[in-house]
UniProtKB/Swiss-Prot annotation:
Homodimer. NCBIfam families: bioF. This is Putative 8-amino-7-oxononanoate synthase. GO terms for molecular function: 8-amino-7-oxononanoate synthase activity; pyridoxal phosphate binding.
Amino acid sequence: METLDGFAREKLDALEAQALRRRLVETDRREGAIAFREGRRLVSFCCNDYLNLSQHPDVKRAAVEATGKYGTGSGASRLVSGNHPLFGELERRLADWKQTEDCVVFGSGYMANMGIIPSLVREGDLIIADELSHACLLSGSKLSGARVAIFRHNDIAHLEELLGAHRGGAKHCLILTDGIFSMDGDAAPVEALAALAAQHDAWLMTDDAHGIGVVGHEGRGSSFMGERKAAVPLQMGTLSKAVGGYGGYLCASAPVVDLIRTRARTLIYSTGLPPAAVAASIAALDFIRGNPDYCKRPVEKARSFTRALGLADPVSPIVPLILGDAEVTLAASALLEAEGYLVTGIRPPTVPEGTARLRFTFTAEHDDADIARLATLVRERIIQRRAAE
Protein backbone atom coordinates (compact mmCIF):
# COMPACT_ATOMS: atom_id res chain seq x y z
CA MET A 1 0.00 0.00 0.00
CA GLU A 2 1.41 3.37 -1.04
CA THR A 3 1.54 6.00 1.68
CA LEU A 4 0.73 9.64 1.03
CA ASP A 5 4.31 10.66 1.87
CA GLY A 6 5.66 7.94 -0.41
CA PHE A 7 3.46 9.17 -3.24
CA ALA A 8 4.66 12.74 -2.71
CA ARG A 9 8.34 11.75 -2.61
CA GLU A 10 8.03 9.70 -5.80
CA LYS A 11 6.47 12.61 -7.65
CA LEU A 12 9.07 15.05 -6.32
CA ASP A 13 11.94 12.76 -7.32
CA ALA A 14 10.54 12.51 -10.85
CA LEU A 15 10.24 16.29 -11.11
CA GLU A 16 13.76 16.73 -9.72
CA ALA A 17 15.14 14.40 -12.39
CA GLN A 18 13.60 16.63 -15.08
CA ALA A 19 14.77 19.90 -13.45
CA LEU A 20 11.10 20.77 -12.95
CA ARG A 21 10.81 20.81 -9.15
CA ARG A 22 9.71 24.16 -7.70
CA ARG A 23 11.00 25.79 -4.52
CA LEU A 24 9.99 28.92 -2.68
CA VAL A 25 12.89 31.32 -2.13
CA GLU A 26 12.49 34.14 0.37
CA THR A 27 12.82 37.43 -1.48
CA ASP A 28 12.92 40.83 0.22
CA ARG A 29 11.83 43.42 -2.35
CA ARG A 30 12.80 47.03 -1.75
CA GLU A 31 12.31 50.34 -3.55
CA GLY A 32 13.18 50.54 -7.21
CA ALA A 33 14.26 47.22 -8.68
CA ILE A 34 16.26 45.98 -5.70
CA ALA A 35 15.68 42.62 -4.02
CA PHE A 36 17.58 40.73 -1.33
CA ARG A 37 18.01 36.95 -1.30
CA GLU A 38 20.00 35.20 1.40
CA GLY A 39 21.53 38.54 2.32
CA ARG A 40 22.67 39.36 -1.22
CA ARG A 41 21.60 42.57 -2.92
CA LEU A 42 20.29 41.85 -6.41
CA VAL A 43 18.78 43.88 -9.23
CA SER A 44 15.53 42.14 -10.06
CA PHE A 45 14.43 41.65 -13.65
CA CYS A 46 11.65 39.19 -12.84
CA CYS A 47 9.01 41.28 -11.08
CA ASN A 48 5.63 42.28 -12.53
CA ASP A 49 5.45 45.49 -10.48
CA TYR A 50 6.04 47.33 -13.75
CA LEU A 51 5.49 50.86 -12.42
CA ASN A 52 7.02 50.16 -8.99
CA LEU A 53 3.80 51.41 -7.42
CA SER A 54 3.84 48.84 -4.61
CA GLN A 55 6.60 50.99 -3.11
CA HIS A 56 5.16 54.41 -3.95
CA PRO A 57 4.69 56.57 -0.82
CA ASP A 58 1.16 57.68 -1.78
CA VAL A 59 0.07 54.10 -2.41
CA LYS A 60 1.51 52.85 0.89
CA ARG A 61 -0.01 55.79 2.73
CA ALA A 62 -3.45 55.02 1.30
CA ALA A 63 -3.18 51.42 2.51
CA VAL A 64 -2.19 52.50 6.02
CA GLU A 65 -4.99 55.06 6.25
CA ALA A 66 -7.59 52.55 5.05
CA THR A 67 -6.45 50.05 7.67
CA GLY A 68 -6.80 52.70 10.36
CA LYS A 69 -10.30 53.58 9.22
CA TYR A 70 -11.77 50.20 8.22
CA GLY A 71 -9.55 47.57 9.87
CA THR A 72 -7.35 44.84 8.44
CA GLY A 73 -10.04 42.72 6.79
CA SER A 74 -13.45 43.02 5.17
CA GLY A 75 -14.92 40.41 7.51
CA ALA A 76 -17.24 38.63 5.09
CA SER A 77 -18.15 37.95 1.49
CA ARG A 78 -18.98 41.11 -0.41
CA LEU A 79 -22.56 39.87 -0.76
CA VAL A 80 -22.95 39.53 3.01
CA SER A 81 -21.32 42.45 4.84
CA GLY A 82 -17.80 42.64 3.37
CA ASN A 83 -18.56 45.24 0.70
CA HIS A 84 -16.79 48.19 2.36
CA PRO A 85 -17.17 51.63 0.69
CA LEU A 86 -13.79 51.49 -1.05
CA PHE A 87 -14.96 48.74 -3.43
CA GLY A 88 -17.50 50.98 -5.12
CA GLU A 89 -14.99 53.78 -5.50
CA LEU A 90 -12.41 51.51 -7.14
CA GLU A 91 -14.98 49.91 -9.44
CA ARG A 92 -16.29 53.27 -10.62
CA ARG A 93 -12.77 54.47 -11.39
CA LEU A 94 -11.85 51.31 -13.27
CA ALA A 95 -15.04 51.42 -15.35
CA ASP A 96 -14.45 55.06 -16.21
CA TRP A 97 -10.83 54.40 -17.17
CA LYS A 98 -11.68 51.37 -19.31
CA GLN A 99 -14.71 53.18 -20.80
CA THR A 100 -17.33 50.66 -19.72
CA GLU A 101 -20.58 50.99 -17.82
CA ASP A 102 -19.57 49.02 -14.76
CA CYS A 103 -16.89 46.94 -13.07
CA VAL A 104 -16.67 44.20 -10.46
CA VAL A 105 -13.55 43.52 -8.37
CA PHE A 106 -12.50 39.99 -7.31
CA GLY A 107 -9.97 38.63 -4.82
CA SER A 108 -7.44 37.87 -7.58
CA GLY A 109 -7.15 37.59 -11.32
CA TYR A 110 -7.26 33.80 -11.12
CA MET A 111 -10.44 33.94 -9.05
CA ALA A 112 -11.94 36.40 -11.51
CA ASN A 113 -11.52 34.10 -14.50
CA MET A 114 -12.60 31.02 -12.55
CA GLY A 115 -15.81 32.88 -11.67
CA ILE A 116 -16.56 34.88 -14.82
CA ILE A 117 -16.28 32.16 -17.46
CA PRO A 118 -18.63 29.59 -15.84
CA SER A 119 -21.10 32.42 -15.20
CA LEU A 120 -21.37 33.14 -18.92
CA VAL A 121 -21.14 29.76 -20.66
CA ARG A 122 -22.01 26.19 -19.81
CA GLU A 123 -22.84 22.83 -21.41
CA GLY A 124 -24.12 23.40 -24.94
CA ASP A 125 -21.96 26.49 -25.40
CA LEU A 126 -18.57 26.90 -27.08
CA ILE A 127 -15.29 28.42 -25.89
CA ILE A 128 -12.44 29.07 -28.32
CA ALA A 129 -9.18 30.10 -26.65
CA ASP A 130 -5.73 31.07 -27.83
CA GLU A 131 -3.32 28.21 -27.14
CA LEU A 132 -1.09 30.47 -25.03
CA SER A 133 -3.90 31.86 -22.89
CA HIS A 134 -3.11 32.09 -19.18
CA ALA A 135 -3.76 28.96 -17.13
CA CYS A 136 -6.71 30.52 -15.31
CA LEU A 137 -8.54 31.17 -18.60
CA LEU A 138 -8.14 27.51 -19.51
CA SER A 139 -9.05 26.32 -16.01
CA GLY A 140 -12.17 28.49 -16.01
CA SER A 141 -13.07 27.09 -19.41
CA LYS A 142 -12.84 23.49 -18.21
CA LEU A 143 -14.91 24.33 -15.14
CA SER A 144 -17.70 25.82 -17.25
CA GLY A 145 -18.73 22.56 -18.92
CA ALA A 146 -18.74 24.22 -22.34
CA ARG A 147 -17.02 22.65 -25.31
CA VAL A 148 -13.46 24.02 -25.54
CA ALA A 149 -11.52 24.47 -28.78
CA ILE A 150 -8.02 25.91 -29.04
CA PHE A 151 -6.72 28.10 -31.86
CA ARG A 152 -3.06 28.48 -32.78
CA HIS A 153 -1.39 31.43 -31.12
CA ASN A 154 -2.60 34.73 -32.60
CA ASP A 155 -3.74 32.87 -35.74
CA ILE A 156 -6.88 34.68 -36.91
CA ALA A 157 -7.35 32.34 -39.87
CA HIS A 158 -7.36 29.28 -37.60
CA LEU A 159 -9.83 30.94 -35.24
CA GLU A 160 -12.11 31.72 -38.19
CA GLU A 161 -11.84 28.10 -39.32
CA LEU A 162 -12.88 26.85 -35.87
CA LEU A 163 -15.77 29.31 -35.71
CA GLY A 164 -16.98 28.14 -39.11
CA ALA A 165 -16.79 24.51 -38.04
CA HIS A 166 -18.28 24.71 -34.54
CA ARG A 167 -20.15 27.97 -33.94
CA GLY A 168 -23.41 26.77 -35.50
CA GLY A 169 -23.78 23.94 -33.01
CA ALA A 170 -23.45 26.11 -29.91
CA LYS A 171 -25.98 28.45 -28.31
CA HIS A 172 -23.32 30.88 -27.08
CA CYS A 173 -19.66 31.31 -28.01
CA LEU A 174 -16.91 32.91 -25.91
CA ILE A 175 -13.51 33.78 -27.42
CA LEU A 176 -10.68 34.00 -24.87
CA THR A 177 -7.20 35.48 -25.10
CA ASP A 178 -4.56 37.29 -23.11
CA GLY A 179 -4.24 40.93 -24.15
CA ILE A 180 -0.49 40.81 -23.51
CA PHE A 181 0.84 37.26 -23.26
CA SER A 182 2.56 36.73 -19.94
CA MET A 183 5.41 34.47 -21.08
CA ASP A 184 6.13 35.87 -24.55
CA GLY A 185 5.25 39.54 -24.09
CA ASP A 186 3.51 39.85 -27.45
CA ALA A 187 0.06 41.37 -27.95
CA ALA A 188 -3.12 39.73 -29.16
CA PRO A 189 -4.58 41.15 -32.41
CA VAL A 190 -7.47 42.52 -30.39
CA GLU A 191 -9.13 44.57 -33.13
CA ALA A 192 -9.13 41.62 -35.55
CA LEU A 193 -10.45 39.32 -32.81
CA ALA A 194 -13.23 41.79 -32.00
CA ALA A 195 -14.27 42.04 -35.65
CA LEU A 196 -14.33 38.25 -36.02
CA ALA A 197 -16.31 37.84 -32.80
CA ALA A 198 -18.93 40.30 -34.03
CA GLN A 199 -19.13 38.54 -37.39
CA HIS A 200 -19.85 35.19 -35.73
CA ASP A 201 -22.10 36.42 -32.90
CA ALA A 202 -19.46 35.55 -30.30
CA TRP A 203 -18.32 37.32 -27.14
CA LEU A 204 -14.67 38.36 -26.80
CA MET A 205 -12.94 38.38 -23.41
CA THR A 206 -9.39 39.63 -22.91
CA ASP A 207 -7.21 38.99 -19.87
CA ASP A 208 -5.20 42.19 -19.64
CA ALA A 209 -3.16 41.33 -16.55
CA HIS A 210 0.08 42.44 -18.23
CA GLY A 211 -1.41 45.27 -20.29
CA ILE A 212 -3.12 47.56 -17.82
CA GLY A 213 -0.93 50.50 -16.87
CA VAL A 214 1.80 49.93 -19.46
CA VAL A 215 0.34 49.57 -22.97
CA GLY A 216 -2.33 51.34 -24.97
CA HIS A 217 -3.47 54.95 -24.88
CA GLU A 218 -2.55 56.42 -21.48
CA GLY A 219 -1.81 52.91 -20.19
CA ARG A 220 -5.44 51.79 -20.50
CA GLY A 221 -4.47 48.36 -21.80
CA SER A 222 -4.51 46.21 -24.91
CA SER A 223 -8.01 47.25 -26.00
CA PHE A 224 -6.60 50.76 -26.49
CA MET A 225 -3.48 49.91 -28.53
CA GLY A 226 -5.07 50.85 -31.86
CA GLU A 227 -6.22 54.20 -33.18
CA ARG A 228 -9.49 53.74 -31.31
CA LYS A 229 -10.77 51.50 -28.55
CA ALA A 230 -11.38 47.93 -29.70
CA ALA A 231 -14.89 46.57 -29.21
CA VAL A 232 -14.12 44.16 -26.37
CA PRO A 233 -17.24 43.57 -24.25
CA LEU A 234 -15.37 41.71 -21.49
CA GLN A 235 -12.19 43.47 -20.30
CA MET A 236 -10.68 41.48 -17.44
CA GLY A 237 -7.43 42.29 -15.68
CA THR A 238 -5.51 42.30 -12.42
CA LEU A 239 -4.48 44.82 -9.81
CA SER A 240 -1.29 42.94 -8.90
CA LYS A 241 1.03 43.88 -11.77
CA ALA A 242 1.43 47.52 -12.89
CA VAL A 243 -1.15 48.66 -10.32
CA GLY A 244 1.13 47.25 -7.62
CA GLY A 245 -1.52 45.80 -5.33
CA TYR A 246 -3.73 42.73 -5.35
CA GLY A 247 -7.03 41.66 -6.87
CA GLY A 248 -8.74 41.14 -10.21
CA TYR A 249 -11.55 42.86 -12.06
CA LEU A 250 -13.99 42.69 -14.95
CA CYS A 251 -15.04 45.85 -16.78
CA ALA A 252 -18.17 45.33 -18.88
CA SER A 253 -21.73 46.54 -19.40
CA ALA A 254 -24.00 47.08 -16.40
CA PRO A 255 -26.19 43.99 -17.08
CA VAL A 256 -23.16 41.73 -17.51
CA VAL A 257 -21.50 42.96 -14.32
CA ASP A 258 -24.78 42.56 -12.44
CA LEU A 259 -25.01 38.96 -13.66
CA ILE A 260 -21.42 38.25 -12.61
CA ARG A 261 -22.05 39.67 -9.13
CA THR A 262 -25.04 37.36 -8.87
CA ARG A 263 -23.55 34.16 -10.30
CA ALA A 264 -19.76 34.10 -9.93
CA ARG A 265 -19.03 31.54 -7.23
CA THR A 266 -15.51 32.89 -6.61
CA LEU A 267 -17.09 36.22 -5.67
CA ILE A 268 -20.05 34.84 -3.74
CA TYR A 269 -18.08 32.39 -1.61
CA SER A 270 -14.92 34.44 -0.94
CA THR A 271 -14.22 37.10 1.65
CA GLY A 272 -13.81 40.53 0.10
CA LEU A 273 -10.37 42.07 -0.36
CA PRO A 274 -8.96 43.91 2.68
CA PRO A 275 -9.57 47.68 2.72
CA ALA A 276 -5.82 48.32 2.49
CA ALA A 277 -5.54 46.44 -0.81
CA VAL A 278 -8.47 48.29 -2.37
CA ALA A 279 -7.29 51.70 -1.15
CA ALA A 280 -3.81 51.04 -2.52
CA SER A 281 -5.27 50.24 -5.94
CA ILE A 282 -7.30 53.46 -5.92
CA ALA A 283 -4.19 55.50 -5.17
CA ALA A 284 -2.17 53.63 -7.79
CA LEU A 285 -4.85 54.15 -10.41
CA ASP A 286 -4.88 57.87 -9.64
CA PHE A 287 -1.11 57.96 -10.17
CA ILE A 288 -1.33 56.07 -13.47
CA ARG A 289 -4.03 58.35 -14.86
CA GLY A 290 -2.06 61.43 -13.86
CA ASN A 291 1.30 60.26 -15.26
CA PRO A 292 0.83 58.80 -18.76
CA ASP A 293 4.45 59.44 -19.79
CA TYR A 294 5.73 57.52 -16.75
CA CYS A 295 3.62 54.55 -17.86
CA LYS A 296 5.62 54.36 -21.09
CA ARG A 297 8.90 53.79 -19.28
CA PRO A 298 8.74 49.99 -18.75
CA VAL A 299 8.36 49.34 -22.49
CA GLU A 300 11.06 51.92 -23.26
CA LYS A 301 13.42 50.15 -20.84
CA ALA A 302 12.63 46.79 -22.44
CA ARG A 303 13.41 48.21 -25.88
CA SER A 304 16.79 49.52 -24.75
CA PHE A 305 17.63 45.96 -23.66
CA THR A 306 16.49 44.26 -26.87
CA ARG A 307 18.25 46.82 -29.06
CA ALA A 308 21.50 46.16 -27.22
CA LEU A 309 21.05 42.48 -28.11
CA GLY A 310 19.88 43.04 -31.68
CA LEU A 311 16.43 41.63 -30.94
CA ALA A 312 13.07 42.86 -32.20
CA ASP A 313 11.41 45.73 -30.33
CA PRO A 314 8.94 44.44 -27.71
CA VAL A 315 5.42 45.83 -27.32
CA SER A 316 5.35 45.18 -23.58
CA PRO A 317 7.77 45.11 -20.62
CA ILE A 318 8.24 41.34 -21.06
CA VAL A 319 11.21 39.96 -23.02
CA PRO A 320 11.71 36.18 -23.27
CA LEU A 321 15.00 34.51 -24.12
CA ILE A 322 14.07 30.96 -25.07
CA LEU A 323 16.82 28.45 -24.26
CA GLY A 324 14.76 25.28 -24.66
CA ASP A 325 16.21 22.97 -22.03
CA ALA A 326 15.14 23.33 -18.39
CA GLU A 327 18.58 22.57 -16.92
CA VAL A 328 20.28 25.01 -19.29
CA THR A 329 17.76 27.65 -18.30
CA LEU A 330 18.34 27.12 -14.58
CA ALA A 331 22.10 27.33 -15.12
CA ALA A 332 21.71 30.61 -17.03
CA SER A 333 19.54 32.00 -14.24
CA ALA A 334 22.17 30.99 -11.65
CA LEU A 335 24.92 32.60 -13.74
CA LEU A 336 23.08 35.93 -13.80
CA GLU A 337 22.30 35.74 -10.09
CA ALA A 338 25.99 35.24 -9.35
CA GLU A 339 26.59 38.50 -11.23
CA GLY A 340 23.97 40.34 -9.17
CA TYR A 341 20.87 39.99 -11.37
CA LEU A 342 17.70 38.16 -10.44
CA VAL A 343 16.11 36.59 -13.53
CA THR A 344 13.99 33.53 -12.88
CA GLY A 345 14.03 30.60 -15.28
CA ILE A 346 10.57 29.64 -16.56
CA ARG A 347 10.05 25.94 -17.23
CA PRO A 348 7.23 23.57 -18.25
CA PRO A 349 4.37 23.31 -17.52
CA THR A 350 4.29 27.11 -17.24
CA VAL A 351 5.56 27.18 -20.84
CA PRO A 352 5.34 24.44 -23.51
CA GLU A 353 7.85 21.60 -23.56
CA GLY A 354 11.12 22.58 -25.20
CA THR A 355 10.61 26.31 -24.62
CA ALA A 356 12.15 26.86 -21.17
CA ARG A 357 13.32 30.44 -20.99
CA LEU A 358 14.68 33.38 -19.11
CA ARG A 359 11.84 35.87 -18.78
CA PHE A 360 13.07 39.43 -18.33
CA THR A 361 10.61 42.02 -17.07
CA PHE A 362 11.34 45.73 -17.01
CA THR A 363 10.04 48.41 -14.69
CA ALA A 364 9.91 52.18 -14.75
CA GLU A 365 12.66 52.43 -12.13
CA HIS A 366 15.29 50.17 -13.70
CA ASP A 367 18.63 51.94 -14.01
CA ASP A 368 19.90 52.32 -17.58
CA ALA A 369 23.42 51.26 -16.55
CA ASP A 370 22.07 48.05 -15.00
CA ILE A 371 20.16 47.29 -18.19
CA ALA A 372 23.26 47.86 -20.33
CA ARG A 373 25.44 45.62 -18.14
CA LEU A 374 22.78 42.91 -18.07
CA ALA A 375 22.56 42.99 -21.87
CA THR A 376 26.33 42.59 -22.12
CA LEU A 377 26.28 39.61 -19.75
CA VAL A 378 23.44 37.95 -21.63
CA ARG A 379 25.12 38.48 -25.00
CA GLU A 380 28.62 37.36 -23.98
CA ARG A 381 27.92 34.73 -21.32
CA ILE A 382 24.73 33.13 -22.63
CA ILE A 383 23.91 33.86 -26.29
CA GLN A 384 27.45 33.79 -27.73
CA ARG A 385 28.49 30.76 -25.66
CA ARG A 386 25.45 28.81 -26.82
CA ALA A 387 26.18 29.76 -30.42
CA ALA A 388 29.74 28.46 -30.04
CA GLU A 389 28.68 25.08 -28.64
